[in-house]
Amino acid sequence: MIPPKPGKTKQAPRRSKTALASISEVSRMPVARWLQLQQSVHDLLIAEEADGFVANLDAIHAEIDLQMRHHADATLTTLIYLGATEINLYSATHSVLVGAVCALVAGQTLAWSASDCDAVAKAALSMNIEMTALQDHLARQSLRPSAEQQRLIDLHCVLGADLLAEFGVKDKLWLDAVRHHHDKTPGPLAAREPFSRLARLIERVDVYAARMAPREGRSPLPPEMAMSSCRLDENGQIDEAGQAVIDTLGKYPPGSAVRLSNGESGIVVSRSVSAEAPKVVALIGADGKALPSPTLRDTGLKQFRVLQSTAHGSLGGAANLEKILRLI
C-alpha cells in the first residue's frame, strides 16, 4: 500500500488478526478468481434460502479484505476496470467494488475502527439484495424504469435490511447502514449517528461506481469524472465522505484509462504520494496502434505526465488485465 498522503490521510488503527499471513505469503488474486467471486456474490444475493448466508458473505468479505490489505492497488485496478467495462453480473460487480472502496476509505483515510470497516464493507456487499436481478435487468434496459420497477427501487433499502435480518444478520449497524444507504442527508460525519456515517460513505461510493459503469443506452463516465460527482453534497458544498473517497483513490484511480503527454494511452495501476502522478501501464502508442507489449510509465516524469482521463473503449482490445497486473 502507498504511504499516507501528508496532511490528508490518518493512520488507521491496526487490527490484531494474527492469523493473517505476511505480505510475502499472500498472492495477488488472479482476474479469473475475481470473476468467480463476483459470480459467488451474485448467487448469494439471489438465493431464496437463508442457510449459510452470513457465513458465506463473511467468507467473501474476508477474501476481498485480505486482497485489499496486501494488494490494494492491484485490487482497485481490477475492480474499477471491471466496474467500468463489464455489464455482465452488473449488480454483483457493483457491490464488490463499492464494498472494497468503502472499507479502504474507512480504514485508510477516515481511521474508523476495525468493526466499522467490516460493517461498511458487508453492508455495501449486501445493500442491493432485494433488487439484484432487477439491477442486472436495468443495466441492459435502454428505457427509463417503469412505475413498478421504480417502486421496487424506492423500497429496496428497507426491504433489503428486513431480508438480511431474516437471513440471520444480527449486526444492527450493518442493517441500519443498508436501510439508509440511499438517504440524501448532507452534513459532517462527526455529527451523525454511527449507522448514518456508514450509510453516507456507501451512498457516495455508490454514486461514483454507478456513474462510471456501463449501461444500455448510456455511456459510462471516465472514473475521474465519476469521482467528481461524489465530491459535492446536495447543497453544492464539499462532502466530507466524498472528499475522503477522492483523497484515498487519487485524481486518477487505479483502473482508470488515461492519456499521457507523449500521446500514449493506458491504464492507471498504482497510486502515488502525488494525486497527479500515478503509475500507468501504456497500451496504445501515439499513432493509435497497440504497443508491442504493455509498458509501465512513471507519470511523475514530464514526458509521461497524465493529460486527462479517457474512455476505456478508446483502448480497444489492447487491455489484457492479467498482463497489466503483472507489471505492478
Predicted stretch roles:
Residues K122-A124, L164-E203, G217-R218, S229-N235, ...:
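Histidine/acidic-rich helix-loop-helix segments that form or flank divalent-metal centers
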Residues M127-N128, D206-A209:
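DG-centered beta-turn motif at the end of beta-strands
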Residues E264-Q308:
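Low-complexity, glycine/alanine/valine/leucine- and proline-rich hydrophobic stretches
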Residues M1-D58, R297, Q303-I328:
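Membrane-cytosol interface segments
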Residues L97-A106, L152-A165, P222-N235:
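An active-site-proximal "capping" alpha-helix that borders the catalytic cofactor pocket
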Residues S115-D116, A133, L173, L221, ...:
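Alpha-helix N-cap and coil->helix boundary residues
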Residues P3, M131-T132, D136, R218, ...:
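Regulatory and interdomain segments flanking nucleotide-handling catalytic cores
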Residues K17-D154, G168:
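Acidic/His-rich, divalent-metal-binding segments that scaffold phosphate/diphosphate chemistry
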